[in-house]
Design a protein with these regions (language model features):
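Alpha-helical heptad-repeat coiled-coil segments that mediate oligomerization/polymerization in large
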Residues: 216-219, 383, 390, 425-429
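Periplasmic alpha-helical coiled-coil/stalk elements that build and connect Gram-negative outer-membrane
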Residues: 149, 165-282, 393, 417, ...
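Terminal intrinsically disordered/low-complexity segments used for targeting and assembly
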Residues: 2-75, 153, 157, 241-288, ...
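Small/polar, glycine/serine/threonine/aspartate-rich low-complexity segments that form flexible
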Residues: 45-48, 52-61, 110-138, 261-279, ...
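Membrane-embedded beta-strand positions in outer-membrane beta-barrel channels/transporters
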Residues: 70, 133-135, 182, 227, ...
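A short glycine-centered flexible hinge/capping loop motif at secondary-structure junctions
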Residues: 213-217, 422-426, 463-467
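Transmembrane beta-barrel architecture of outer-membrane proteins
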Residues: 25, 66-68, 131-133, 180, ...
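Sec/SRP-type N-terminal targeting helices
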Residues: 81-82, 98, 143-171, 197, ...
C-alpha cells in the first residue's frame, strides 16, 4: 500500500524553516528620548550627606520609632495594598499573553456510538456503529512569522514592569507621608508645650500685676495688657492642641491599623534630627532610579511594541491545529497495530479588505507612542522641578534654622533682662510685655522652621526616588 504523502515527521520538516524565522519583531528599534532638562541641578548645591543612590529609607530615617511606624504602614496601609494587588494582576496578564508563544498540548479521549437508518447507510440497511479515539491534540497555535504575538508579549511585560515601578513609587510616597506626618506631630507637640509654658509664665505675670495694682504700683492698663496676653496664650493653646490632634489623626490613617493611635509614641522634646542629610547625585542617576520615570519609560516601551503588533496585522497569519493518537471501532482495539491516527490542519489567513481597520490601528499605535514620549518627558521635567525645589528648600531652611535659633536665644536673654528691669522699676511694663511676645513668637518660629527643614529633607528623599535598592515591591 502506498504511504501517505504527508506524515507528522514530514510536516515538521516542512515547517522547520517557518519555525526558525517565527518571532521576528516588526516593532521599531527602541531609543530612549533625550531628557529635556539641564545636565546639572539648578539652584544651590546640596549639603554634604549620604548619596541617595546608596541610601535606603531605613538608613535615611535615623529615629528607630519612626522606622517602626513606617514598617507598620507598609504592612497595613490599604492604598498600598491595592497597588500591590495591581502588580499581581499585571503579572498574571503578562503570563497569559506569554503563554501564546508556546504551543499547547492536551490529552483527549472520546467514544461515539450511533445508529444509521437504511436510507443513509452505504449498504442500504440500518445498523449501529461505534468508534473510540485516544490521543494528544494541539490547540490552535499561531506561527509568529511577523512578530505579532511577540510584540503583544513585550507590551504586556513592559506594562507589568510599569505597574511594579508605579507601586514602588506609591511605597516611597507612603514612607514620605508617614515621616512627614510624624514630623508634623512632633512639631505640633513642641509648639503645644511651648504654649503651655508661656501660658503658665503669663499667668504668673498677671498674678504679680494684680498684686502690684492692689498696692498701687501698677495701673489698670498694665493689668489689661497682661490679661490680654494670657487670653492670647489660651487661644494659641487650643490652636496647637487642634493641630497636634489632626497630625495624630493623619498618622493613624496612614498606619492603617485599628490600634494605630496606641502605637504612636510621644516624641521626646530633646530628640535630635529624625532624618539625615542626603546628597542628590547626578541628573542621569535620577532618570535610572526614580520609579515614576522608570514606569513612564516602561509605558513608552509598551507603546513601541504595540506598533510592531499593528504592523504585523497587515501580513498573513498561519495557525496550526492537529492531533495524534489511536482510533478503533472497538475499545479493546485502541492499541492494536494499525490503529494509529493523526490529523493536521494548517490555516492561512490573509487580510484583503478591512475598510481601513489595520491602517487606523497602526495610526493609533503611533499616536499613543507619541503621547507616551510626551508623558515620559513631562515626568522627567516634573521630577527635576521637585528635586530643584527640595534642594532650594533644604538649603534655605538650614540657614533659616540657624538664624532663628540665634534670634530665639537673643530674645530669651532680652526677656530675662526686661523682666529684671521691670521688677527693679527701671523699665515700663509695656516693654516687658513686648519682650514676652517677641520671645514666644521667635521660639515658635524656630520650632516651625526646624520641623519644616526635616520635612523638606523628606521631600528631597522622595524627589530623588527614595534610595531605591532595586528589590521587587511585591512577592514574585
Amino acid at each position: 500500500m502506498r504511504k501517505p504523502a504527508f506524515t507528522p515527521s514530514a510536516v515538521l520538516l516542512a515547517l522547520a524553516p517557518l519555525l526558525l524565522i517565527a518571532g521576528c519583531s516588526m516593532a521599531p528599534t527602541y531609543e530612549r528620548p533625550d531628557a529635556p532638562v539641564a545636565a546639572n541641578w539648578s539652584g544651590p548645591a546640596a549639603q554634604p550627606g549620604r548619596a541617595a543612590s546608596n541610601l535606603d529609607w531605613q538608613t535615611f530615617i535615623v529615629d528607630s520609632e519612626l522606622r517602626d511606624l513606617v514598617n507598620i504602614a507598609l504592612n497595613n496601609n490599604r492604598s498600598l495594598r491595592q497597588t500591590l494587588l495591581d502588580i499581581e494582576q499585571a503579572r498574571a496578564q503578562y503570563r497569559i499573553q506569554r503563554s501564546e508563544r508556546v504551543p499547547g498540548l492536551s490529552a483527549s479521549a472520546n467514544g461515539n456510538r450511533q445508529r444509521l437508518p437504511g436510507d443513509l447507510s452505504s449498504n442500504g440497511s440500518s445498523g449501529v456503529s461505534s468508534s473510540y479515539q485516544v490521543g494528544l491534540s494541539l490547540p490552535e497555535y499561531e506561527l509568529d512569522l511577523f512578530g505579532r504575538v511577540k510584540s503583544l508579549t513585550d507590551a504586556a511585560l513592559e506594562q507589568y514592569l510599569a505597574t511594579e515601578d508605579a507601586a514602588r513609587s506609591a511605597q516611597i510616597a507612603l514612607i514620605a507621608e508617614v515621616s512627614q506626618a510624624y514630623l508634623s506631630y512632633d512639631g505640633a507637640q513642641r509648639r503645644l508645650l511651648l504654649t503651655e509654658q508661656t501660658l503658665a509664665s503669663r499667668e504668673d505675670s498677671l498674678a504679680l500685676i494684680a498684686q502690684r495694682r492692689s498696692a498701687g504700683a501698677a495701673t489698670a492698663l498694665d493689668y489689661q495688657e497682661a490679661l490680654g496676653l494670657v487670653e492670647q496664650s489660651r487661644a494659641e493653646l487650643e490652636s496647637n492642641a487642634r493641630q497636634k490632634q489632626q497630625s495624630l489623626n493623619a498618622l493613624v490613617l496612614l498606619l492603617g491599623t485599628p490600634d494605630a493611635a496606641s502605637r504612636i509614641p510621644l516624641v521626646p522634646l530633646d530628640k535630635p534630627m529624625l532624618v539625615q542629610d542626603i546628597a542628590p547625585g547626578t541628573p542621569s542617576e535620577l532618570i535610572e532610579r526614580r520609579p515614576d520615570i522608570r514606569a513612564a519609560e516602561h509605558q513608552l516601551k509598551a507603546r513601541n511594541a504595540d506598533i510592531g503588533a499593528a504592523r504585523a496585522a497587515f501580513f498573513p497569519r498561519i495557525s496550526l491545529t492537529g492531533s495524534f493518537g489511536t482510533s478503533s471501532a472497538e475499545m479493546s482495539g485502541l492499541f492494536d497495530g494499525g490503529s494509529r491516527s493523526w490529523n493536521f490542519v494548517p490555516t492561512l489567513s490573509l487580510p484583503i479588505f478591512d475598510a481601513g481597520r489595520n491602517s487606523a490601528n497602526l495610526d493609533l499605535a503611533k499616536v499613543r507612542k507619541d503621547s507616551a514620549v510626551a508623558a515620559y518627558e513631562g515626568t522627567i521635567q516634573t521630577a527635576f522641578r521637585e528635586v530643584a525645589d527640595a534642594l532650594a528648600a533644604t538649603d534655605t531652611l538650614r540657614r533659616e534654622e540657624i538664624a532663628r535659633r540665634a534670634l530665639a536665644n537673643t530674645t530669651e536673654e532680652t526677656l530675662k533682662l526686661a523682666k529684671a528691669r521691670y521688677e527693679g522699676g527701671v523699665d515700663s511694663h509695656l516693654r516687658y510685655l513686648d519682650a514676652q511676645r517677641s520671645n514666644f513668637i521667635n521660639e515658635a518660629a524656630y520650632i516651625e522652621t526646624s520641623t519644616q527643614r526635616q520635612i523638606a529633607l523628606v521631600d528631597l528623599f522622595r524627589a530623588l526616588g527614595g534610595g531605591w535598592d532595586g528589590k521587587p515591591v511585591a512577592q514574585r
